[in-house]
């Protein structure tokens, strides 16, 4: 049974299939989710991930059911085992966004049907797939790229680092804080992406951000609104990436 909890759950062939499915579904209509019910549980707030899954499921002719985490009896007396086993009686897939990866692992243990990690505290495979799709779309390949990560170490970075195993001669440099919570904002200000930083990059370089961005803190407005910024394309590609993932699960 297929699941997507982490990028490391995939082999290179599966990863490339998802990218190919995403590319195909960007230009043609398919209905692999006909008569399928997909539950969406979002413990954390979401704009791009939620909407891209909802629209993607609709476009693939599936049904999505929003399950409010705060309304589940998990907060009172019902166990994760009972909750997810019951959900598996009604749903075909589960898309789960959570504050704690351990909750995702419990869902995987008890739901016993395909699960997609829509973000946890240590992993964001959907974002990584979308980002790599965007890089491939922009450069024609994901091989032989120099990728620099600026800012805090987070779930997106951890997932992107796992993707490097599927590339050839791609180098990743990480310029990041050590995540000292006490002085985090002060420390991270040293890693702001601004015109000075972008001026030393290659002529064909691009700026990406998973959004939402703290403009004026993480990145200047000149950069995120500038010619090298492809953040809107990156956000748009969340839709085709989610569709590629969903099709991969369906076959």
Show which residues each predicted segment covers.
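Glycine-rich phosphate/diphosphate-binding loop of Rossmann-like nucleotide-binding domains
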Residues: 43-55, 137-182
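C-terminal helix-to-coil terminal segments
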Residues: 221, 225-251
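Short, structured coil segments at secondary-structure junctions
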Residues: 60, 90, 110-112, 201-203, ...
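Anion-binding alpha/beta catalytic cores of soluble intermediary-metabolism enzymes, centered on
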Residues: 84-87, 92-163, 209
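Positively charged, low-complexity intrinsically disordered leader regions
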Residues: 1-51
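Phosphate-coordination loops involved in phosphoryl transfer and adenosine-cofactor binding
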Residues: 32-38, 143-145, 204
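Active-site cofactor/substrate anionic-group-binding motifs, chiefly glycine-
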Residues: 37, 42-90
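Rossmann-like adenosine-cofactor binding region
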Residues: 179-222, 228-229
